[in-house]
Amino acid sequence: MCSCNLYFNGELVMEDVMIVEKKGDKVIAIDLFGDKKEFVGEIKKIDLNENKIFIEG
């Protein structure tokens, strides 16, 4: 299983992210427990080696 930490503008905002989806100007992230957060911004980097996702908005 691969879960990632999600950073928004350089700040850790979610852990154990399992799903990331881009819809319009929003990025929707869902964690291991089904909790969902929406961010207005763009995915800038996904580093699977470090298990990190970076969004800027």
Curated annotation (Swiss-Prot):
Top-level taxon of the source organism: Archaea
InterPro entries: CooT
Any Pfam family hit: CooT
Name the UniProt record assigns to this protein: Uncharacterized protein MJ1551
Organism: Methanocaldococcus jannaschii (strain ATCC 43067 / DSM 2661 / JAL-1 / JCM 10045 / NBRC 100440)
Source lineage: Archaea, Methanobacteriati, Methanobacteriota, Methanomada group, Methanococci
